[in-house]
């Protein structure tokens, strides 16, 4: 493996004179839709903007430049972007607002047509984020949809005051599920150099970060595209030995979730025993139409291996309900899979047809009322399992990363190593950080606890489940 010499984002500052503020810094506002990868990319470009002399502001009204980081995985975020761009165009006509668009939707013809319609000035695909300095210097409409190799080379500065952070380790996806647009928008898998990953994590550690999440469309494939790179299991061991108290990863693919990964988790205390393993459907017939490359038996065998090596593992999954051609019998197989696995958590979605995918081209969609009805049944099934699993934690002491105020009055909220949301009395955890918490009560969606050794709080009415 050749050496890699990491460098931080440090472009020379450049900014035009803002209207009405000659000589002042231009102001930018970033709006992010979608996954944690998009959140990481937004942090990266925010760092770019600051290094260029821009000021980041909290609202569209304050901004000279609004950059929208888009998602194209489902139809709902696409429509949100369409609506937002319509509003931004009015601001552009009124006061000369500069509009930028990045992310997965920008890579698609659908997004590019939106950009033309709504007067987008800067359009960057997910692989072209490092073109931003050039785009802002152009002083004219700038579009870049290339996949630049240097997009993986930059190390953004640690987010100020953050206790947790994301670190991208691989971009793109080599799987071609028939419903998914990601291989089109983000390209094939490209692993980031391990020197860069470790350098970024070391900087986060020095900045006080106590929890790092390794990100990728398929983190399990890390290193396979680059001879001499460590495997994902080896990378987990390396990161787990750096002194960061908590290490997580997202997202995995059942085909690539191999035994050596399970062993690395079991043998590395810093790796959280929270495993998100998307199944999408419990029906082999539907999995075949989805081109998921595994079948129910293989998935359940992976779950068995995980349970054997990690009996305290917390499992979550993704489910698509109402995929084209899904029958009631197919759906019943998904429900029965739930009972075999007993997921702690699940992210459940109605199938959303995406232009450009094989499923969109070749399969006829199911009636919406059928999809909604099945989703409601699945949600009830998951609610039952979540409550059952959460009750198992009552009376146990867990480590909770408290991050800030909860919506529930009198509480602060954090999450344990199993990614359960945990509420504790605000008086017991006055500042964000890691606390030992005894779980006192559970609902299907929340755990309630008290900080070990803290003075008993005055009774606080618990929210109704």
UniProtKB/Swiss-Prot annotation:
User: Which reaction is recorded as catalysed by this protein?
Assistant: N(6)-dimethylallyladenosine(37) in tRNA + (sulfur carrier)-SH + AH2 + 2 S-adenosyl-L-methionine = 2-methylsulfanyl-N(6)-dimethylallyladenosine(37) in tRNA + (sulfur carrier)-H + 5'-deoxyadenosine + L-methionine + A + S-adenosyl-L-homocysteine + 2 H(+)
Q: Where on this chain does [4Fe-4S] cluster 1 bind?
A: 35, 71, 104
Which residues are in the TRAM domain?
A: 391-453
Instruction: Check the record and name the Gene3D superfamilies matching this protein.
Output: Methylthiotransferase, N-terminal domain, tm_1862 like domain
| Cellular component, GO annotation | cytosol
Q: Enumerate the GO terms in the molecular function aspect.
A: 4 iron, 4 sulfur cluster binding; metal ion binding; N6-isopentenyladenosine methylthiotransferase activity
Q: Which cofactors are reported in the record for this sequence?
A: [4Fe-4S] cluster
Q: Which residues bind [4Fe-4S] cluster 2?
A: 173, 177, 180
How far does the signal peptide extend, from start to end residue? none
User: Per UniProt, what is one Pfam family of this protein?
Assistant: UPF0004
Q: Which positions fall inside the MTTase N-terminal domain?
A: 26-141
Its domain of life reads: Bacteria
What region holds the Radical SAM core domain? 159-388
Q: Where in the cell is it found?
A: Cytoplasm
EC? 2.8.4.3
Is the keyword Transmembrane helix assigned to this protein? no
Q: How is the cofactor bound?
A: Binds 2 [4Fe-4S] clusters. One cluster is coordinated with 3 cysteines and an exchangeable S-adenosyl-L-methionine.
Q: Per its UniProt record, what InterPro entries does this chain match?
A: Elp3/MiaA/NifB-like_rSAM (IPR006638), Methylthiotransferase (IPR005839), Methylthiotransferase_CS (IPR020612), Methylthiotransferase_N (IPR013848), Methylthiotransferase_N_sf (IPR038135), MiaB_methiolase (IPR006463), rSAM (IPR007197), rSAM_horseshoe (IPR023404)
The UniProt keyword set, sorted, is: 4Fe-4S, Cytoplasm, Iron, Iron-sulfur, Metal-binding, S-adenosyl-L-methionine, Transferase, tRNA processing
Q: Which family does it belong to?
A: Belongs to the methylthiotransferase family. MiaB subfamily.
Summarizing the function annotation, the protein's role is: Catalyzes the methylthiolation of N6-(dimethylallyl)adenosine (i(6)A), leading to the formation of 2-methylthio-N6-(dimethylallyl)adenosine (ms(2)i(6)A) at position 37 in tRNAs that read codons beginning with uridine.
Kindly state the subunit structure of this protein.
Monomer.
Name of the protein in its database record:
tRNA-2-methylthio-N(6)-dimethylallyladenosine synthase
Species, as recorded:
Thermus thermophilus (strain ATCC 27634 / DSM 579 / HB8)
Which taxonomic lineage does the organism of this UniProt entry have? Bacteria, Thermotogati, Deinococcota, Deinococci, Thermales
Q: Which gene encodes it?
A: miaB
């Amino acid at each position: 493996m050749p050496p890699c010499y990491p460098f931080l984002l440090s472009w020379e500052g450049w900014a035009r004179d803002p209207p009405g503020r000659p000589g002042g810094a231009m102001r930018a506002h970033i709006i992010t839709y979608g996954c944690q990868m998009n959140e990481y990319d937004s942090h990266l470009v925010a760092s770019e903007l600051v290094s260029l002399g821009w000021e980041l502001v909290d609202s569209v009204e304050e901004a000279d430049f609004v950059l929208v980081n888009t998602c194209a995985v489902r139809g709902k975020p696409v429509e949100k972007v369409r609506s937002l761009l319509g509003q931004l165009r009015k601001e552009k006509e009124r006061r000369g607002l500069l509009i930028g668009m990045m992310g997965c939707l920008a890579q698609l013809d659908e997004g590019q047509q939106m950009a033309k319609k709504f007067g987008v000035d800067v359009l960057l695909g997910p692989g072209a984020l490092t073109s931003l300095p050039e785009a802002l210097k152009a002083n004219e409409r700038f579009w870049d949809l290339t996949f630049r190799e240097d997009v993986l080379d930059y190390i953004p500065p640690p987010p100020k005051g953050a206790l947790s952070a994301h670190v991208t380790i691989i971009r793109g996806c080599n799987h071609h599920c028939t419903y998914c647009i990601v291989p089109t928008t983000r390209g094939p898998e490209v692993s980031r150099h391990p020197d860069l990953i470790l350098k970024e994590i070391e900087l986060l550690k020095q900045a006080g970060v106590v929890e790092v999440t390794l990100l990728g469309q398929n983190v399990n494939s890390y290193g396979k595209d680059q001879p001499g790179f460590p495997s994902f299991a080896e990378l987990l061991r390396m990161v787990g030995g750096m002194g960061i108290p908590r290490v997580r990863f997202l997202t995995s693919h059942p085909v690539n979730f191999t035994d050596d990964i399970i062993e690395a988790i079991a043998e590395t205390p810093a790796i959280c025993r929270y495993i998100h393993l998307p199944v999408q459907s419990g029906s082999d017939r539907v999995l075949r139409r989805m081109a998921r490359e595994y079948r129910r038996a293989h998935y359940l065998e992976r779950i068995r291996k995980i349970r054997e090596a990690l009996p305290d593992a917390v499992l979550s999954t993704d489910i698509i309900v109402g995929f084209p051609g899904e029958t009631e019998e197919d759906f019943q197989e998904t429900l029965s899979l739930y009972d075999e696995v007993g997921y702690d958590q699940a992210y459940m979605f109605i199938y959303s047809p995406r232009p450009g995918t094989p499923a969109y081209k070749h399969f006829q969609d199911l009636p919406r009322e059928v999809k909604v009805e099945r989703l409601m049944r699945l949600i009830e099934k998951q609610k039952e399992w979540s409550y059952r699993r959460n009750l198992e934690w009552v009376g146990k002491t867990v480590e909770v990363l408290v991050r800030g105020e909860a919506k529930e009055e009198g509480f602060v909220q954090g999450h344990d190593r199993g990614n359960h949301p945990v509420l504790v009395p605000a008086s017991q955890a006055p500042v964000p950080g890691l606390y030992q918490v005894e779980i006192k009560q559970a609902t299907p969606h929340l755990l309630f606890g008290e900080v070990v050794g803290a003075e008993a709080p005055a009774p606080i009415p618990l929210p109704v489940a």
